[in-house]
């Protein structure tokens, strides 16, 4: 009986040692993410994602507004395309994430300055937009106008 009690006590101590040696759980809240990311400002064209992904000539100062609106109406995600060619996906500050289209629709085809929390992962960029304004001083060439 004493032998079984000793074995159980040793096994229990081993489990406690292993649990204490495990790394702490990963942070998952937006507050924790914000603590690890900095506020940034990006500038670029609000448009559908399909054209600049499929057409390398797609850039931040020239687009077909009809094509962009057709893609957006069909459900293509909205992005901000910078002059450097980086695409920023707008995301919410909540989990689960919620749609940002309503916030961005008035800016489709416009060059904007967006400020917020920026995230990057393996070359993909996202931004939680806290402020967005049109940059009227940047000329965007719209096909068909």
Where are these regions (language model features)?
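Hydrophobic h-region of N-terminal signal peptides that target proteins for export
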Residues: 11-20
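OB-fold and OB-like single-stranded nucleic-acid-recognition modules
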Residues: 20-145
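Bacterial N-terminal signal peptides that target proteins for export
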Residues: 1-11
């Amino acid at each position: 009986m004493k032998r079984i009690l000793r074995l159980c006590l040793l096994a229990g101590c081993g489990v406690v040692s292993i649990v204490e040696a495990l790394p702490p759980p990963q942070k998952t809240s937006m507050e924790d993410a914000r603590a690890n990311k900095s506020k940034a400002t990006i500038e670029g064209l609000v448009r559908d994602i399909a054209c600049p992904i499929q057409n390398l000539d797609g850039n931040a100062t020239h687009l077909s507004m009809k094509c962009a609106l057709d893609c957006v109406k069909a459900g293509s995600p909205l992005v901000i395309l910078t002059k450097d060619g980086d695409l920023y996906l707008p995301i919410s500050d909540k989990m689960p994430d919620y749609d940002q289209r309503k916030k961005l629709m008035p800016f489709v085809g416009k060059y904007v300055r967006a400020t917020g929390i920026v995230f990057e992962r393996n070359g993909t960029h996202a931004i939680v937009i806290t402020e967005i304004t049109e940059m009227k001083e940047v000329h965007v060439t719209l096909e068909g106008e």
